[in-house]
Amino acid sequence: GGFTLGLIPIVFLILSLVVGFIFRKKIEQASMNSSVSSYKKMGLMVETIENVENIKSTGAGIKILNNWNKLTHDAIDDDIEIRHYSDMANYFTVFFQQICFVSIVAIGAYTITESGSITMGALIAITILSGRILQPISQLPSYFVQWGKSKLAIKDLDSIYKLPSDNEGVDKPLTPYLNRVDIKATNIKFGYLKDKSAINVASLNINEGEKVAILGAIGCGKSTLLKMIAGLYKPTEGNVYLNGIDMQFINRDLLNDTISYLPQSTKLFQGTLRDNLIFGMIGISDEQIIEACKLTGLIILLNDLPKGLDTIIPEGGESFSGGQKQIIALTRAIIGNKRVLLLDEPTASMDEGTERHIIGMLKNRLYEKQTLVVVTHKPIVLSMVDRIIVLTNDGIAIDGTKQEVLQKISTNNNVARG
């Protein structure tokens, strides 16, 4: 009789565990769906705040609101689903506990009256012990909810840690002395999508001190090529070398000290104007800052600001126009006077007068051994360079001196008109 009574809680313990694991998968999946919905809501909110003017001007507010409502309903449905499965698991667990208790009492009473193989005290002890065995099982549903959310958090963290980083796979990046800064690229390919390459260049050589312009149609990969030369993007195929050393092997700090990169889209950071001008640079004096401001014309804006270099810039730099932000970024790029200057559409947001001033300043500022690579669509920018590379979706179409390339382009245009 005692063996039978002892077997009852074991059987119901196994049944409770089976039910718990059945609902575990459902709770885990619902928790993942809930977290994904929350992430999407957060992403939509940030995107809306950053583009509120575009949304207003295009009348897309209703669409954004509908998307928000849909994501909110999805998140609510996921939370309801989690609660439903959690409650179901709780109900089954409590049900098994009650059945177990009733079964032990009933079979125990029958055993006492019929065979007397156990005493009343033993029956009471068995019911107490069985309750203590099954009581922790009732906590399983809440544990499964936490388990599902924890697994998703760990999965997200793992995906972040698995993202490629600077010097991927290199334990000790190199910090060699670069007596020259010749740039070479061989068989490089890069694609933002797996099935489509944004750029495909078989061979490219830029020697120290060359002044090079990269031309091409929209979407042919000019900006992407510049980012790979800056060491910001790793080619999906091929290699980019600096002085004969693969950039992936060179310490990021050394690249930052050697290469100055001005992106096409200018971003300012929250802080003072001074902070933005010397962002990431060490040991820059006020004299260097003022000199660079005079060269770019930023000194005019600086003198109009009541706090000068201590002017607070809000997040995103929205208090400045596009042209002003571009001048600030260009000033930042030339302050360090680095050996390689990479400019992506450096005058795109400037008026004609400011553009002429900037081009003239750069022509006088660039020293003989300083390498310049500029991406542009504007003919005036070509006055700074002595070599032009024309890029297409298939790779480099034309590469030569400025006079040779411009003559070929002119000839091709005349043939096309004819």
Where do the model's predicted regions map?
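Loop segments that connect adjacent transmembrane helices in multi-pass transporters
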Residues: 33-81
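Catalytic Walker B motif of ABC-type/P-loop ATPase nucleotide-binding domains
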Residues: 341-345
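Hydrophobic alpha-helical segments in the permease module
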Residues: 13-15, 86-100, 120-142
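Helix-to-loop junction immediately C-terminal to a conserved catalytic motif
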Residues: 230
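A short, proline-enriched helix->beta-strand linker immediately N-terminal to the Walker B motif
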Residues: 335-339
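Transmembrane helices of ABC transporter permease
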Residues: 1-33, 106-118, 135
